[in-house]
Amino acid sequence: MLKKYLSNKTINLLEYYSTLNINNIFSNDITKSKHWSFANKEMLVSQLFKEINDQLNTKNNNNFFYKGNPDSQIMILGDFPNDDDVKNQEILSGSRGELLNKMLSSISLDKEKYYLSNIYFDKETDIRNRNNFYKDILIKHLKIIKPKYILLLGEIVSNFFNNSKNKILDIHGKWDSIIINKDKFITFTTFDPEILLGEPENKKLSWEDLKKFRNEIYKNL
């Protein structure tokens, strides 16, 4: 009966996750709680990032994995680290990070008001061969942070959520949602700042997206 109330993309995503057997991701009682403390969230994300480092045989620090406030109801997701991020050991750094900061400041979002991370944490050519691993990581990540809103930066991130191949000009500025177990996450897609650096003509579209996102979150948070 539930399926008739869900979009096809949500149904497909749920069915995909069921094939990965990720209905109960954490057995620890802490992770079953609806209201974790800031300290518990930090501990859990650190454990998650250790799992990623172990899988990738890397020693990246926490600044490479996230920025901002784990208690925020606003999560921002980029795609994968670029050379600046790897060199600086900091997520979305360099010119891309500078532009993102300006974009977020324009809608009064400083790093205490959001939690920023990626869906991928390496940039190897076979990265998509690890999609199952990264989908599992993302589900764990969402269950820890429990954001109400997720701002998706670019088509790679949006398509990762929806198992699709849409172009950013077709999907930017659009709301959607996913449901994982009983948790609902509202998503909104806009441009990756790295794309805007190469295609500045799309900055006006990005600004319209951000205003739309701002109006929604300040009305409901």
Language-model features: locations:
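N-terminal low-complexity, Ser/Thr- and acidic-residue-enriched intrinsically disordered segments
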Residues: 2-24
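A polyanion-binding, active-site-adjacent surface
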Residues: 16-19, 23-221
